[in-house]
Amino acid sequence: MSMPATSTKTTKLATSLIDEYALLGWRAMLTEVNLSPKPGLVDRINCGAHKDMALEDFHRSALAIQGWLPRFIEFGACSAEMAPEEVLHGLRPIGMACEGDMFRATAGVNTHKGSIFSLGLLCAAIGRLLQLNQSVTPITICATAASFCRGLTDRELRTNNSQLTAGQRLYQQLGLTGARGEAEAGYPLVINHALPHYLTLLDQGLDPELALLDTLLLLMATNGDTNVASRGGEGGLRWLQREAQTLLNNGGIRTPADLDYLRQFDRECIERNISPGGSADLLILTWFLAQI
């Protein structure tokens, strides 16, 4: 399909640099889905609480999305002179086109819709920072992404029309702002919690997969995951957070033997039809930013 135009402005970014960041985004998606065992989520062992998707769907989806990540970076660069709050409007058509390719690659299965939003924002932020010759760090990337999303929660969640979306309903009922709120706040769960936790575990010499699984537990314990709440209600969300925190309090995931606790947690999530997809999306961002 034809790609939406980015801007009439030109970018000075090298294609090799753009492709390098796009490759990191693809690797981040693959790293997350291949990580096993993950409670309630699709991984190399099973399909978690999902009956409509499998590991191969995520592999195809990630490849389809990778082709669009350079467009987000390019738009971020080309729109560098725009006010940041005007950028999101220009990103939407790119995101919708990317989403269309994802659905075509998976025969209609929603594998990475959340990641298109979050990785798209971060890639656009990287493009803007590079174009402006500003420092590209996890903190500056997330702060720039937040500036794109200023007012997003108010505009899209705080509405009183009769046809509420799932996100609007969860916001009104439980006060959960989901992916929009996390983006508008500059991804504090990643910047202040998951990323430093993951990097500390790596510095301590922990196996990277075990470190990432432990970081997933941290996200599950702290994230007001709208995916979980939509499937299991407030009770399901509180149960998941409590169980994840209990595992962390008991020492977390430090050895291969600890994976037995995750396998049991996975079985319980499947029985409850709970899948922490929002936390999985944040784990993708955590790994992505850890490489920068």
Swiss-Prot record:
InterPro entries: CitG (IPR002736), TriPribosyl-deP-CoA_syn_CitG (IPR017551). Coiled coil: none annotated. Keywords: ATP-binding, Nucleotide-binding, Transferase. One of its GO terms (molecular function) is triphosphoribosyl-dephospho-CoA synthase activity. One of its GO terms (biological process) is prosthetic group biosynthetic process. HAMAP family: CitG (MF_00397). This is 2-(5''-triphosphoribosyl)-3'-dephosphocoenzyme-A synthase. The gene is citG.
